[in-house]
Amino acid sequence: MSKMKLDDLDHQILDMLIENTRIPFTDIAKKLLISAGTVHVRVKKMEEYGLIKGSSLILDYDKLGYTFIAYVGLYINDTSKIKFIVQRINEIPNVTVAHITSGKFNIFCKIRAKGTTSAKNIIFKLDEIDGVYRTESMISMEESINDKKR
């Protein structure tokens, strides 16, 4: 598929959708002084091209009681087990992000917990996965930047 060329109108539509994925096409159309049909066609093209991949729900973890955030680096003794280890990590619901990385750790995870006891139990679960020989944890003191628009 060839590269999709976005014009200013496409960028304006995207900016509005990034700000609020649930904004009705009619609202976008009114603000941009175009028809809702134009918005629909352009969004559909961006979806077909794969530029837009659905929409997402953003949870307020604080309101759910998950105020404790930690980052856990996993050292793996056999990198051929990484796929298996990632599958096991995916079974732990409190692990919200996992990256296969270069450098100090083989896998780097973000966990959310209701407190230190819960976080300890999650970290122990990660440490018990076959193939993980050590973990290293860092507690997040404050999430200063979390810009979903970047």
Model-derived segments and spans:
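A compositional/biophysical signature of low hydrophobicity enriched in polar/charged and small residues
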Residues: 1-150
